[in-house]
Amino acid sequence: MRKYLTEFIGTFFLVFTVGLTVTAGSPMAPLAIGSSLMIMIYMGGHISGAHYNPAVSLAVFLRGRMASVGELLGYIVSQLAGAITAALATYVTAGKTFAPAPGDSASVLAALLIEILFTFALALVVLNVAVSAKTQGNSFYGLAIGFTIVVGAFAGGPISGGAFNPAVGTGPILVHAAMGGGTLTHLWLYWVGPLVGGALAAGVFGLQEAGTA
């Protein structure tokens, strides 16, 4: 239970930071979001692994680092609950809803590729700095993971909306739609892209680890 509580809390503060910075129109939103992820990773890494992202949980599961499918589903449910609660908290505190969406001039294919590639980068960094036995005990893993999101959000956010996380996509989109602010049109994008990216990262990590002691 403590793992699921930690995943809920970490995902909540990640998505709450997304909501408050995006609705305020802050040009430094990517830095705030990456920093939020970093500090939540240091908060919960020793308890749950600090995934806060169904795509990362999938990658960790595919590498055999989760006990069961049931545990994977527990992580995902906790992450989605945290994201939905954060989107509601954003509405209560900021008076606005928000939702990621592709840029006006971006094609669906371009947005999908951005979500795949930067989620791949995120999950691969997580696997190498927070899962690999060769880097156990390091103190930089939170910084590396958080700044992967900073890079992805600045570089790819204008194209895809910069979720790189099904929870970051789902919670805000559901609340935004429920409040009459939009539709579920792009919801699939923030599941398919990140999950493909996470699965690819698991495969590449396996190749990186192959034959190493």
Regions found by a protein language model. Give the residues of each.
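Membrane-interface helix-loop junctions and terminal tails of multi-pass membrane proteins
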Residues: M1-A213
